[in-house]
Amino acid sequence: EPCTDSPLFGLEEVVVTPHLGASTVEAQDRAGTDVADSVLKALAGEFVADAVNITGGKVDEEVARWLDLARKLGLLAGKLLDDAPVALNVTARGELSTENVESLGLSAVRGLFSGIVSEPVTFVNAPSIAESRGLDYSVATETEARAHRSALEVKAVAANGATATVVGALTGLEAVEKIVRINGRGMDMRAAGRNLFLRYTDAPGALGKVGGQLGDAGINIEAAALTQAAKGDGAVLVLRVESEVPEELETSIAESVGAQSFQ
């Protein structure tokens, strides 16, 4: 039977875990390895499926594939706002809607606040940060998914009433994470690498100004995508760049095309 009374229990340097119930050396070794792997995931901010203090319920393999994309969509939706977020609505569409997707909402909240607060945002503290910041977040499902078998939609609402909606999907045999819609307009951009976002009123020559300044600074553009701007509405240009864009250059680019920008 496990020890129930020891002076070691009172030491701050000692972390006590529940009795593993492993009756053989091999079982104890495997159980210990599993615990160590879970600790490493938690320290890296990754999702720990068997953690007792994470909300969201059981996470199946299919849902787990979407966790990182949900985080990125939450971060992007928050960046597109020009005021503090007060609500975040996450909707799983298509085949994904048949799964338990509560954890995807949690991951999106984590992404949203990772671009706002200075402290690390984890699956454990994300709900408490949301509560302290007055954020109302929800998770819903819809059977319909435009152009994809499954898609994840994240809508952020700002205190001033402005909204930002981004949609992502896992595409191809390798399940490549992509951003497929921003504010109702289609695009096709990998959700990876270092990206420069510009929200501006599209005009002839604007794209050339942006590319020219980046080229003059020796910054290579690996990929680019531009939303289809509706008449009188702003466009969103996404540039995946090889290196970080200095703040002064980012400001100069934004001013040259009358844009709001972020990386």
Region locations from a protein language model:
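Rossmann-like dinucleotide-binding domain for NAD(H)/NADP(H)
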Residues: 1-80
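A conserved regulatory-domain signal marking ACT and ACT-like small-molecule sensing domains
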Residues: 56-263
